Amino acid sequence: MAVRGINKVILVGRLGKDPEVRYIPNGGAVANLQVATSETWRDKQTGKMREQTEWHRVVLFGKLAEVAGEYLRKGAQVYIEGQLRTRSWEDNGITRYVTEILVKTTGTMQMLGRAAGAQTQPEEGQQFSAQPQPEPQSEAGTKKGGAKTKGRGRKVAQPEPQLQPPEGDDYGFSDDIPF
């Protein structure tokens, strides 16, 4: 089977606001996140530090959306794996576009740290994935070839089977204002 391309996005950033969770007609949860990523560098001409922040719209589905709504808050640091998608719609005769990172059944969301004032966050480094994960190895896990390793046990949420996101570009709801 020939591979025609890979569409995978990995982000590590902070939430700009609390997640917005909605439920679509089939009962599945959809969460919208605004994730900021920043890079800093020293300006060669002035010698001053510069920073550029990019904002990313992330859409989570199913159990991941519910977990995000329950545990994530503004300022929380997250690791996201998903796919890049651009969708379009008509607004008063004008075609509008939005590019989003979709975290579906093959995606991952991991909480990396605690936001200031967060009280209901689970353990730091808690990972939630839309696909079943293998059980973590014990302290004396083995690598391929029999070499012993010391593993850090990590709690991994075992999600229930996921609902597929609805077909089409509207994800089961209509957004008049995309941002």
From Swiss-Prot:
Record keywords: DNA replication, DNA-binding, Plasmid
- Asked if the Swiss-Prot or TrEMBL record annotates the protein with the keyword DNA-binding, the reply is yes
List all disulphide bridges recorded for this chain. Answer: none
Regions of compositional bias (Acidic residues) in chain numbering = 167-179
Biased composition of type Polar residues is found at: 118-132
Which residues lie in Basic residues bias regions?
145-155
PROSITE patterns the record matches: SSB
A GO-annotated cellular component: nucleoid
Q: Which residues bind DNA?
A: 55-61
What Gene3D superfamilies does the annotation carry? Nucleic acid-binding proteins (2.40.50.140)
Q: Where is this region: Disordered?
A: 114-179
GO process terms (BP): DNA replication
Q: Which residues form the SSB domain?
A: 6-110
Give the matching InterPro entries.
NA-bd_OB-fold, Primosome_PriB/ssb, ssDNA-bd
What's one GO MF term for it? single-stranded DNA binding
- CDD domains annotated for this entry? SSB_OBF
Functional description taken from the UniProt entry: May contribute to the conjugative processing of DNA. It has a functional relationship with Psi (plasmid-mediated sos inhibition) proteins.
What does the record note on quaternary structure?
Homotetramer.
* UniProt name for this protein: Plasmid-derived single-stranded DNA-binding protein
